[in-house]
A protein has these predicted regions:
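S-adenosylmethionine-dependent methyltransferases
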Residues: 2-281
Length: 281
């Protein structure tokens, strides 16, 4: 069963707001990223709407300050298809927290991580608004995680005493427009960020001695160089493509895909027996 999801948009000059049904190919799609609030419904969260506050800017500043389509696609898939009850889940690049919130409401303990501390105040508010103040500390943890930082990765691992069960990420694999040459884009170029993300996923996957954590990653193709990340992943992970039939019907024809990764057994043995020096990743 699928549920529609909805968003708040301004409807007139007085800036009053109304709840407007969303479709991926509808006229309102581009407005969703600029809306102050978005509201989502999920089939397994009956009688509950998730409200997410956004602070995205039209100039592209603060990419984590809006809910991108991949976050909804991943959250919607996970709540229907993956049993997360009593699991310890790590979200990489959580942004405004939609995926983490949904999994928490499905009774997982979720460690929401991001490399941008400026997002944390709004992220905390989204958690409180949807999970409840009394449950936030019981069911979630917000952690700074800059990809490749050994100390921060160890802090995340230590939040799961019995080991990480699941790792999730949405819209973290992207390359900026290669025609735009500036410092910010260079810092986010594929040859810098993709190896860091790969090593982070590999490290976090190597420390559960009982089982290998499953990784679910939602991805929307933008530029061809993004394929280099998946080439890296194939070196150490078994890769499964989630069927498009299992994706929300609004996105079946979109370019959003969900991948499932599982660390290869021989890689897990190597990583757990050979420890690198601190912060060497």
């Amino acid at each position: 069963m699928y549920e529609c999801f909805l968003l708040f948009v301004s409807t007139n000059a007085s800036n009053s707001q109304a709840l407007v049904p969303f479709t991926y190919h509808g006229a309102e799609h581009k407005k969703t990223f600029l809306a102050a609030n978005r509201v989502f419904e999920f089939s397994k969260l009956t009688n509950q709407r998730i409200k997410i506050t956004q602070k995205y800017k039209a100039n592209g500043a603060g990419l984590g300050s809006a809910v991108w389509d991949g976050s909804f696609v991943l959250a919607e898939y996970m709540q229907r298809k993956v049993d997360v009850k009593d699991k310890c889940v790590v979200e990489i690049g959580c942004g405004l927290g939609l995926v983490s919130i949904v999994l928490s409401l499905r009774n997982a303990f979720v460690i929401a991580t991001d490399g941008d501390e400026n997002l944390f105040p709004i992220l905390k508010e989204n958690f409180k608004d949807n999970i409840g103040i009394s449950n936030v500390n019981k069911k979630t943890s917000i952690n700074l995680l800059r990809w490749g930082n050994r100390t921060q990765m160890d802090n995340v691992i230590n939040k799961c005493p019995n080991g990480i069960d699941l790792i999730v990420a949405a819209d973290v694999v992207f390359e900026h427009d290669p025609l735009k040459k500036n410092v910010k884009n260079n810092l986010h170029s594929a040859n810098v960020t993709f190896p860091l993300l790969y090593n982070t996923l590999k490290y976090l996957s190597s420390h559960n001695k009982k089982k290998r954590p499953e990784i679910y990653l939602a991805y929307k193709q933008r530029y061809s160089r993004e394929g280099s990340f998946f080439s890296l992943m194939q070196d150490s992970f078994d890769v499964t493509h989630i069927s498009r039939r299992d994706i929300h019907r609004d996105f079946i024809k979109a370019k959003i895909k969900i991948f499932k990764f599982l660390l290869k057994k021989e890689v897990q043995i190597t990583n757990t027996t050979t420890r690198k020096a601190k912060d060497e990743l």
